[in-house]
């Protein structure tokens, strides 16, 4: 298996936009909990951690970039704790880990940071206002039904001048698998059902963070491309990650001939010269701060001492000197 990471300068297309997810019930959260429990209980569960390890380390890098010590932090939807293993107790002194999967919490990775586990849904955080200096999240928020509400809760539990640093998959994720399955079903069954869960578009994320109350926003995109022997191996690894579709309108079973046709289409349309096939994961990274009086603020309109009209005088001033 070959994993490569590269930055995206632009987004060519977006599959689904969910800026209005508030009040929607897209995902079966009980099913997602069972999927995560099953995946984390596998004897070889670490075999499927490669994507979470990569993204967790990149979230940790952004924590170090802030260059401050956080007395108390929260990891929302921590899974097996793939962020904390890349952090030190000199940066994060104490950590709360939350997840809907008790098995994930029991089988979490070790860290030198003193940690406390709380089984909790990302959509219902059981913490008081102004509790945490830092909130983290990596590859769990794309399964939340009410993403605007979850971001508001994160904002609420942060202390003033606290920071939220997160990562979630974006709308271009697994486009190869999505297209291959749709084309195969159209050909074999005369129509198609959704097999890949809907993801948030990068164009919506900044607006969602702003609406939740965050300021000094940063949103950037990475693309992680993993090469597999074939489409069936892509689907096997998604299951091992606990990342199978849990949308209420998912199709439970694929016909065998449709699956074989999709695998052939996948290899024909996207296959590499060595016979492998790529699977693309678009990762959206976000940083948002809870407002505080000490933070820098934009100058008031009209308060500048220099006008753009003065630029024409620069040459004259230089010649006078």
Swiss-Prot record:
Single GO term (MF): monooxygenase activity
Keyword Mitochondrion appears in the UniProt entry: yes
Entry superkingdom: Eukaryota
Transit peptide range per the UniProt entry: 1-25
Pfam family, one: Methyltransf_11
Keywords assigned: Membrane, Methyltransferase, Mitochondrion, Mitochondrion inner membrane, Oxidoreductase, Transferase, Transit peptide
Entry-linked InterPro entries: Malonyl-ACP_OMT, Methyltransf_11, SAM-dependent_MTases_sf
Main location per the UniProt record: mitochondrion
Cleaved signal peptide residues: none
A GO CC term attached to the entry: mitochondrion
Location in the cell: Mitochondrion inner membrane
EC number(s) reported in the record: 1.-.-.-, 2.1.1.-
UniProt record, GO biological process: methylation; mitochondrial respiratory chain complex I assembly
Subunit structure: Interacts with NDUFS7.
Main function: Arginine hydroxylase that mediates hydroxylation of 'Arg-111' of NDUFS7 and is involved in the assembly of mitochondrial NADH:ubiquinone oxidoreductase complex (complex I, MT-ND1) at early stages. May also have methyltransferase activity.
Protein family membership: Belongs to the methyltransferase superfamily.
Protein's name according to its UniProt entry: Arginine-hydroxylase NDUFAF5, mitochondrial
The species this protein was found in: Danio rerio
Taxonomy of the source species: Eukaryota, Metazoa, Chordata, Craniata, Vertebrata
């Amino acid at each position: 298996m070959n994993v490569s990471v590269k930055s995206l300068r632009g987004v060519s297309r977006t599959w689904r936009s969910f800026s209005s997810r508030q009040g929607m019930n897209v995902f079966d959260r009980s099913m997602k909990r069972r999927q995560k429990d099953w995946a984390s209980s596998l004897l070889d569960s670490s075999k499927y951690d490669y994507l979470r390890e990569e993204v967790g380390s990149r979230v940790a890098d952004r924590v170090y970039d802030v260059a401050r010590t956080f007395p108390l932090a929260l990891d929302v939807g921590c899974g097996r704790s793939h962020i904390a293993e890349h952090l030190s107790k000199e940066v994060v002194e104490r950590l709360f880990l939350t997840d809907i999967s008790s098995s994930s919490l029991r089988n979490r990775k070790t860290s030198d940071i003193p940690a406390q586990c709380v089984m909790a849904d990302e959509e219902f955080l059981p913490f008081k206002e102004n509790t945490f200096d830092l909130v983290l999240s990596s590859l769990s928020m794309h399964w939340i039904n009410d993403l605007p509400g979850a971001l508001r809760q994160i904002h609420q539990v942060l202390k003033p001048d606290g920071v939220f640093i997160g990562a979630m998959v974006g709308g271009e994720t697994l486009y190869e698998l999505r297209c291959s399955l749709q084309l195969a079903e159209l050909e074999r069954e005369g129509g198609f059902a959704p097999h890949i869960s809907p993801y948030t578009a990068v164009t919506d994320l900044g607006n969602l963070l702003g609406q939740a109350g965050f300021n000094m926003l940063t949103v950037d995109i990475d693309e992680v491309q993993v090469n597999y022997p074939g489409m069936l191996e892509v689907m096997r690894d998604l299951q091992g990650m606990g990342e199978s579709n849990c949308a209420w309108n998912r199709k439970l079973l694929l016909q065998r001939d449709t699956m074989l046709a999709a695998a052939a289409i996948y290899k024909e349309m996207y296959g590499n010269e060595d016979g492998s096939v790529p699977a693309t994961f678009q990762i959206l990274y976000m940083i948002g701060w809870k407002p505080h009086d000490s933070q820098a603020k934009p100058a008031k309109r009209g308060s500048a001492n220099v006008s753009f009209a003065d630029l024409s005088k620069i040459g004259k001033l230089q010649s006078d000197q």
